């Protein structure tokens, strides 16, 4: 199974918890906002990591959906 990860740049407040929890999937861009390092995740471990980051985002800026 594969999942698509995205971050709503208008919603993101740059808390960086996603990049801290899941650095293989998320990074901070030059504007101080989170962005996915990879658009599609196929590894279940990375999915679980990204899901934890999504659930920890204080403004719900992260979306994960089946690809």
UniProtKB/Swiss-Prot annotation:
Q: What name is this protein filed under?
A: Ferredoxin
What GO molecular function annotations does the UniProt record carry, in alphabetical order? 3 iron, 4 sulfur cluster binding; 4 iron, 4 sulfur cluster binding; electron transfer activity; iron ion binding
The segment(s) forming the 4Fe-4S ferredoxin-type domain are 3-31, 36-67
Query: What's the gene?
Result: fdxA
Keywords assigned by UniProt? 3Fe-4S, 4Fe-4S, Disulfide bond, Electron transport, Iron, Iron-sulfur, Metal-binding, Repeat, Transport
Q: Which cysteines are joined by disulfide bonds?
A: 22-49
Q: Which cofactor does it need?
A: [4Fe-4S] cluster; [3Fe-4S] cluster
Q: Which organism is it from?
A: Pyrococcus abyssi (strain GE5 / Orsay)
Which Gene3D superfamilies does the entry link to?
A: 3.30.70.20
**Residues that coordinate or bind [4Fe-4S] cluster:** 12, 15, 18, 57
Secretion signal, residue range per the UniProt entry: none
Q: What is the cofactor note? A: Binds 1 [4Fe-4S] cluster which readily converts to a stable [3Fe-4S] form.
* Role played: Ferredoxins are iron-sulfur proteins that transfer electrons in a wide variety of metabolic reactions.
